[in-house]
Design a protein with these regions (language model features):
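A short Gly-Trp-Pro
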Residues: 2-34, 41-186
Length: 186
């Protein structure tokens, strides 16, 4: 993946993210995938993806997903449909609209207006492990410790690290399952 980033000179010590140009046409991969929000009020389906799974470290993406980076995958517009509900939309810049579930807050969508595709958050996929990142950009916002993640101590599973709370959380789980359902109590 060849990516070109353009940044202006720092203003008041901050670098501003201005443009990202992907210097190739991502390959369209026919596949069926589904996904949606945590509560199940918003669901989607796609009949193809692009080989563009990536993470973006820019500050705007960090704010949009409430995390250190956004994990996204491109989907051709003609292959995508909302199957239950629709996200609430927020215009984060003139060309970009982001979508999230109004009920549970799950970030779902990054939509650049003039693009032939849209991006969904990889974490909202029913099988996110199937689409590991193939690239990253927005490096001006990347956390300085990002490269050290694999060196952080692994404390164990939820059941091991939260043994006192895990059974009650599991027994009262309101999260939508990782597959389509005919209906849901969202």
């Amino acid at each position: 993946m060849i990516i070109h980033q353009s940044h202006p000179e720092p203003l008041s010590g901050n670098k501003a993210y201005t443009a990202v140009t992907i210097a190739y046409e991502p390959e369209r991969i026919p596949t069926i995938l589904t996904g949606g929000c945590q509560c199940g009020a918003v669901r989607y389906r796609a009949d193809a993806v692009l080989d563009s799974s990536h993470i973006c470290h820019c500050r705007m993406c960090q704010k949009a997903v409430g995390n250190f980076f956004a994990a996204l995958i491109g989907i051709p517009r003609d292959a995508f449909q909302w199957t239950r509900g629709a996200p609430t939309l927020f215009k984060s810049s003139d060309p970009v609209t982001r979508g999230f579930c109004a009920k549970c807050g799950t970030p779902l969508l990054y939509d650049y207006a003039t693009s032939k595709h849209l991006n969904v958050t990889t974490g909202s996929l029913d099988n996110p492990a199937a689409f590991p990142p193939r690239g990253q950009f927005g490096s001006e916002g990347r956390m300085s410790w990002f490269g050290d993640l694999s060196q952080i101590a692994d404390e164990g599973t939820t059941e091991e690290t939260m043994a006192e709370f895990a059974p009650a959380i599991k027994a009262s789980n309101h999260q939508h399952p990782d597959h389509d359902t005919d209906d849901w109590r969202a």
